Amino acid sequence: MKTYTFPENFWWGSAASGPQTEGRVSDDGKGENIWDHWYELEPEKFFDQVGPEKTSQVYTKYKEDVQLMKETGHNTFRTSIQWSRLIPEGTGEINQKAVSFYRDYFTELLDNGIEPFVNLYHFDMPLPLQEKGGWLSRETVDAYVSYAAACFELFGDLVKKWFTHNEPIVPVEGGYLYQFHYPNHINMKEAVQVGYHENLASAKVIKAYHEGGHDGEIGIILNLTPSYPRDETNPEDVKAAKIADAFFNRSFLDPAVKGEFPQELIEIVKELAIMPEIHEGDLEFIRENTIDLLGINYYQPRRIKAKETPINHEHSPMPDDYFDNYDMPNKKMNPYRGWEIYEKGIYDILTNTRENYGNIKCYISENGMGVEGEERFVNSEGIIEDDYRIEFVTDHLKYVHQAIQEGTNCVGYHMWTCMDNWSWTNAYKNRYGFIAVDLAQDGKRTIKKSGRWFKTVSEKNGFDA
C-alpha cells in the first residue's frame, strides 16, 4: 500500500458541457445550433432517438446538481456556455434569460466552494452561422470573437478560468473528414480551413482577454491521443506515427503553446495544394497570443503502423493516406466504448508537455470511462457500484502523480463527467458520470459509489493504493 499525495490546492472535479447537460424549456430563448438541427433532420441517427432538447435538465436542476458536486468533493467544475443560448442568432442580440441562468449557475458554484471553469465552444455552432459555412467562414471567426468578448464582460467577475475551445480537432474530424458531426462532409481541404480558423479564433480571443484587463487565465482544452508506432525500431512505423501525431495532436497543441504549426503538417498541405486561406497578420496573431493554461483530455492512445492498405481514392486525400491504425494484440479494452485503456498514456502526455512544451501549466481536463447498462451494478440500496470506474481513475491518477513528482506542472484532475450526460449521437448509451441520471424518472440523480469515493480523494488530496 502506497500513499499518493497531490500538490496543495490541487483541482479536484469533473467536466461537462452546455449542450450535453442543459436541455431546453419552451421559453428559454435559446437559438438553434447544429445539434438541434441535425436531430430534427435525422433523429434515427441518435441512440434511442434521444435528442439535445432533453439531456440532463441542468437548466432547471442546477441548484440540486451543485449540492451533489459538493457531496462528491468538487472544488472546481468545468462547463461551457452555449453560444446559441447566449446569442440565439450567433451574432447580434443577447438573450437576457441566458445571462441570468449562467450568472445564477456560476454564483451557485462559487457560493458552495466550487470554482467554475468555463469553455466557450463545445461543438455547438449556432445554426445561422453554420448556414453561412460555420468554421469554414472568416465571418464565424469574427462572430466568435464578439461572442467571447460578451462572455468576458457578462461573467468575468465570476469566472477566472476560461477556455477557447474543447477538443477543436473533433469538429475537423467529425464534420469534415469522418462524418460523425454535422455537416458530415468528407473534404480535407475544408478540414484544413476549419482547423486553421479555429486556431486563429482561439488566438484572437486570447488577445482580447489579455488586453481587456481581465484578472484570470485563458487556455484551450485538447484531446491528446499519444501516437505509438507499432515497432519503435522500424523507421517507417515511426514516421507514420509522427505524421498521425502532427494531424491529430500537434495541429492544435503547437499553435496553442508555441504559436506555430508543425512543419510536417505544413509540408503535407502544401504538397496537396490545400493550404488554408491566410490573411496578412494572421500568423503573427497566432504566434503572439498563446495560452496561459492547457487542459488535457485523455481517453485512449493511437496505435500506428506504416501505410499497408490501399489508399481510398474515392475520398482522397485523407489523413489516413499516410498511416494505418494498428490493432495491437492483447491490449486492455473498455468493451462498451471500444477504446483501449492505456494508463501510461497520461504520463507520456504530461512528460511531453514538460520536455517539449516549456512545462506549461496544465491539468487533466477529462479522463473517464463510458459503460453501457450500469443498472446491472445497482446494489440493494439503489447505488451503482462502479468499482471499474474507481479502478480506472485510480490507475490514471497514479501516473499523473508520477509525472508531477518528476516536475510536470500539472495542477488538477477532472473526470468526465459529473452526472451522466448526453453524448451526441450516442445520447445516453454509455454512462460516464459520478452521478446517475434516470431518464425514466424525470432525470432523478443518484450518486454512484465512485462519487462517494472521489469525495474521500478530494478531502485527503490523494489516496492509498
Which residues does each predicted region cover?
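Glycine-rich, proline-tolerant flexible connector loops at the mouths of alpha/beta enzymes
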Residues: I81-I94
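Catalytic domains of carbohydrate-active enzymes, especially glycoside hydrolases
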Residues: K61-Q82, N289-L293
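Aromatic- and Gly/Pro-rich amphipathic surface segment
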Residues: E32-Q67
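Active-site region of glycoside hydrolase catalytic domains
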Residues: M1-F46, E89-T91, V99-A465
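N-terminal, well-ordered alpha-helical segments
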Residues: T60, Q67-K70, S100-R103, T107
